[in-house]
């Protein structure tokens, strides 16, 4: 068997998430269906580095899969890309070692979250940015987001009832940009891993701080108390993008560890 690693992007609007689910359209199901056609009708299982939820998008999701023979990687990429549905793009395919695992090999993820703060909202962005109809002071959020950087127990920012025991993660970079011409806030988080709904909960909290309904110090309070009830609401998934995944063997990996 030959193992392949692929970078994929997708518009999550019409998917019930990445991972295969019964009676639901998923990214995994669509790619596996295409690979089966390319593999003479034999099943191929793919593994994903991140399990994005319903409505969540990706520019840089990474998958791996095995095929019974070596293939030209560009021909394989082209075949997959042209036969997958239009809302999935196969960006790159490469052959990797048999022990490579896209989820368990050490890596760094970057997520982006787009928030439309236009009044009125932009209906063309309804599937691609979460609308926030209340006024915000961006400088308050820029000050508060600094407290998320570092190694912390993010219990207060994960979904209640999660089964993950170790909730310590490291965020290497967190920032907010504002595209005035589009009324878009762009939140960017880079870290060694993120808990279930962590990014969406952090954004929901920062927006509440920006609106003045929580103090700038609330981030520190939540981290210290490890209490989800102290955080803001979970922002909707349509604004979330898995932007990039960098593995330990890639040159730029060390830049984030400094």
From Swiss-Prot:
It comes from Streptococcus agalactiae serotype Ia (strain ATCC 27591 / A909 / CDC SS700). Keywords: Isomerase, tRNA processing. GO terms for molecular function: RNA binding; tRNA pseudouridine(38-40) synthase activity. It holds the Pfam family PseudoU_synth_1. Its EC number is 5.4.99.12. This is tRNA pseudouridine synthase A. It catalyses: uridine(38/39/40) in tRNA = pseudouridine(38/39/40) in tRNA. The keyword Mitochondrion does not apply. The active site is at residue 53.
């Amino acid at each position: 068997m030959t193992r392949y690693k692929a970078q994929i992007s997708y518009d999550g609007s019409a998917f019930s998430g990445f991972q295969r689910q019964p009676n639901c359209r998923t990214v995994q199901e669509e790619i596996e269906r295409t690979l089966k056609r390319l593999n003479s009708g034999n099943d191929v299982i793919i593994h994903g580095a991140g399990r994005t939820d319903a409505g969540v998008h990706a520019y840089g999701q990474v998958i791996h899969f095995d095929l019974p023979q070596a293939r030209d990687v560009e021909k394989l990429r082209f075949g997959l890309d042209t036969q997958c549905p239009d809302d999935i793009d196969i960006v790159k395919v490469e052959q990797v070692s048999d022990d490579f695992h896209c989820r368990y090999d050490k890596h760094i993820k970057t997520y982006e979250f787009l928030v439309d703060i236009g009044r009125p909202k932009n209906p063309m962005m309804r599937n691609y940015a979460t609308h926030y109809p209340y006024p915000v002071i961006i400088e308050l959020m820029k000050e508060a987001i600094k407290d998320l950087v570092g190694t912390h127990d993010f219990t207060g920012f994960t979904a209640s009832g999660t089964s993950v025991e170790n909730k310590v993660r490291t965020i290497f970079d967190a920032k907010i940009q504002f595209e005035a011409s589009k009324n878009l806030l762009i939140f960017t988080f880079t870290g060694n891993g993120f808990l279930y709904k962590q990014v969406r909960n952090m954004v929901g909290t920062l927006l509440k701080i920006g609106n003045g309904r929580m103090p700038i110090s609330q981030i520190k309070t939540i981290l210290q108390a490890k209490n989800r009830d102290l955080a803001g609401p979970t922002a909707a998934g349509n604004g979330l993008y898995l932007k990039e995944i960098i593995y330990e063997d890639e040159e730029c990996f060390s830049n984030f560890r400094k």
